[in-house]
Amino acid sequence: MNQIIDHIAVIGGGAWGTALAQTSRRAGRRVTLWAREPEVARAINATHENPDFLPGVSLDPGLHATADLAEALRGAEAVLVVCPAQALRPVLTTARPLWPGRAPMVICAKGVEQGSGARMSEVATAVLPEAPLAVLSGPTFAREVAEGRPTAVTLACADGALAEALVLALGTRTFRPYASTDVVGAEIGGAVKNVLAIACGVVEGLGLGDNARAALLTRGLAEITRLGRALGARSETLSGLSGLGDLILTATSMQSRNFSLGFALGQGRTLDQVLGERRSVAEGVHTASAVVALAARWAIEMPICAAIHGVLSGDYDVTSAIESLLSRPLRVEGGSESQIHPTAKTATP
């Protein structure tokens, strides 16, 4: 029999945290949302709207928000952690003494930690080893989830029974989690696609055409697959919702923070200019260097991610980055992807 999860805490009052709190209320759960900014919590409670991060979306009146982390966690039977990837370690360190017993943690952040190269589940296990762990990932825009538009995601947990219990707790008619036991696969797809989305945005901003973007998406999926398989992920996860599905969504829409950032770079704007106009985080900016370092550690070729890391770090301009990709040797597709060497021509008599 699956355990029953009724009381959910959501750590993170941004767009995605608010959307997950809203869909959890639709699933009939008691929900407390923690927002770092007291004014965000006050606005949600007073107006049933998050005007800073999800303006115009009406929230369930039963959704309670607080800026007091202890209050948010008290009595929770599951905790959704919805903070930027690079903030996960400090957020969990603060939450650790307040954690509600052995309540499972569902990580909803997508990225790789800078410096350590750790996946989000590895960070969580290091800080809170006693908390059962799951990962929620997939093709999602926060506003559409909050508005109740049809969405499907992967919910991965090494404990299959817990994965199913969380699916039952969070699932609704329009929010469809699919249970998986492949945590690594769910994480790698969700992290790397943010870097690839920046690349696709650059291609769009430069006006290189649909052919180029399709090629970049396909070769980007090959990079996700190479890294994921090296780390132990299953191929079907990488070609599923949290891999290919998330890549298609994030790398083809201006709703994506990462795609729109890449588009602006392709149009000639600087990274500082683009980031200076934003309040929300484009995770690919921080994940690029960590993914490239992780790939180097495992001797995995990821030329698209490396090119975008070069752009973000100031080593290349966008035109040079694209040129570096186009000048790579021709290869066999699939398998070992061995390089094709030209055969020297011999003169005919």
Swiss-Prot record:
Keyword ATP-binding: no
Binding-site list for NADPH: 16, 36, 110, 142, 257, 281, 283
EC number: 1.1.1.94
Pfam families in the record: NAD_Gly3P_dh_C, NAD_Gly3P_dh_N
Record family assignment: Belongs to the NAD-dependent glycerol-3-phosphate dehydrogenase family.
Listed GO biological process terms: carbohydrate metabolic process; glycerol-3-phosphate biosynthetic process; glycerol-3-phosphate catabolic process; glycerophospholipid metabolic process; phospholipid biosynthetic process
Example GO molecular function: NAD binding
Protein's job: Catalyzes the reduction of the glycolytic intermediate dihydroxyacetone phosphate (DHAP) to sn-glycerol 3-phosphate (G3P), the key precursor for phospholipid synthesis.
Record localization: Cytoplasm
EC top class, as a word: oxidoreductase
Keywords: Cytoplasm, Lipid biosynthesis, Lipid metabolism, NAD, NADP, Nucleotide-binding, Oxidoreductase, Phospholipid biosynthesis, Phospholipid metabolism
Active site (UniProt): 193 (proton acceptor)
The protein's name in its UniProt record: Glycerol-3-phosphate dehydrogenase [NAD(P)+]
Major localisation: cytoplasm
Catalysed reaction, written as an equation: sn-glycerol 3-phosphate + NAD(+) = dihydroxyacetone phosphate + NADH + H(+); sn-glycerol 3-phosphate + NADP(+) = dihydroxyacetone phosphate + NADPH + H(+)
Residues that hold sn-glycerol 3-phosphate according to the record: 110, 138, 140, 193, 246, 256-258
GO cellular component: cytosol
Keyword match NAD: yes
Pathway per the UniProt entry: Membrane lipid metabolism; glycerophospholipid metabolism
